[in-house]
């Protein structure tokens, strides 16, 4: 299935080249830029070409080409690299048409705003383009070349622990193999939807794995197509179950690019949003997504000692438990568009026993924000229900709640009596009590609503 999607992506990319990135030449200044390649150049290439672009707060808007000559200070702009600072290494993945990735600048700028660091961007477009199976054959050689540079940097004062690799798709496995070459002594690796095709059944030695760095995290958003479905880090964030992201409906053909790659690239965009500090994006440990949605995993007590892991740059994703967990799956919900901030609202209902199955719609409203709609099915043999929903605002900013008895399609649905409905935000914090309404009676097609008066 994934191979079919890769072929479709290559075909559709021909139609949407402009959407893949800015292909304009670098300005007349001496700013370095990504390589671009064509099919003819790719066929004629005799060896893999890798180059490195350096960005720091001193040259945040004008990347410099970084080579081993830089380490000998034979180039004027080499003073930008500061071995006493941490170094973020960005590694892109598969490039279908040989174009530079359009997102690199945004990610680098977000990292520099957050911390005073060196940002090294690995440009291996020449080896990452066109035939995916051949690209996979190249990834270890790319990792070897990167490791040579890292080894040189350690001789000039950098430490292995100071390196944080951020790999997108196939770039996650490149980063992982660099970590393997350094026996897991790199400081951190972040895999943004690590590639799945040709890696799902691979040995841990040949893919990203928790042994590749002191701390490895991964964000999964397309595990049923381009991304890997298994946990590969100390902690693995599965956004919206790790597949079928909100706002990436496959039924729409308005954007062919979005149709093919939207889910896969959501990990990157959510990560960048987390760096921009829009809101805390925290995950809950759970055995599965359905169990999480059913409200069975509402704390982070085990194995995180009550501190939920958070996407971003906190040390070890905010995990304070020792030893670190391994391949721990955590789940979280997001909204359909940036900044993807979602507050996890636990909805608990107690219903008087029914004669027939029933269907209701629950709507949570916050002024100035999209509504949250939940469609719930109620059964004759159950009276208590729990579910988790994503809402764009915190609990204390929910202004009203509405219930609609939507009825059955092929039979007349009777009235429904709710003993109570409670909504609360998870993880629960001190001073944030649940909002509860008792003794609710709704007839078919007659909306019921309740307004909350709150001040955050």
Curated annotation (Swiss-Prot):
Presence of the UniProt keyword Transferase in the record: no
Annotated signal peptide: 1-21
Catalytic machinery residues: 169, 193, 264
Compartments where located: Secreted
GO molecular function ontology, one term from the record: phospholipase A1 activity
Enzyme class: hydrolase
UniProt EC number: 3.1.1.-
GO BP annotations listed: lipid catabolic process
UniProtKB keywords: Disulfide bond, Glycoprotein, Hydrolase, Lipid degradation, Lipid metabolism, Secreted, Signal
GO cellular component, one term: extracellular space
Disulfide bridges in this chain: 248-262, 286-297, 300-308
Domain of life where this protein originates: Eukaryota
The reaction(s) this protein catalyses: 1-(9Z-octadecenoyl)-sn-glycero-3-phospho-L-serine + H2O = sn-glycero-3-phospho-L-serine + (9Z)-octadecenoate + H(+); 1,2-di-(9Z)-octadecenoyl-sn-glycero-3-phospho-L-serine + H2O = 2-(9Z-octadecenoyl)-sn-glycero-3-phospho-L-serine + (9Z)-octadecenoate + H(+); 1-hexadecanoyl-2-(5Z,8Z,11Z,14Z-eicosatetraenoyl)-sn-glycero-3-phospho-L-serine + H2O = 2-(5Z,8Z,11Z,14Z)-eicosatetraenoyl-sn-glycero-3-phospho-L-serine + hexadecanoate + H(+)
Glycosylated residues (UniProt): 35-36, 72, 82, 276, 305, 350
Subcellular location, principal: secreted
Stored PANTHER family: LIPASE, PHOSPHOLIPASE A1 MEMBER A
Role this protein plays: Hydrolyzes the ester bond at the sn-1 position of glycerophospholipids and produces 2-acyl lysophospholipids. Hydrolyzes phosphatidylserine (PS) in the form of liposomes and 1-acyl-2 lysophosphatidylserine (lyso-PS), but not triolein, phosphatidylcholine (PC), phosphatidylethanolamine (PE), phosphatidic acid (PA) or phosphatidylinositol (PI).
Family: Belongs to the AB hydrolase superfamily. Lipase family.
Protein name: Phospholipase A1 member A
Native organism: Danio rerio
Encoding gene, per UniProt annotation: pla1a
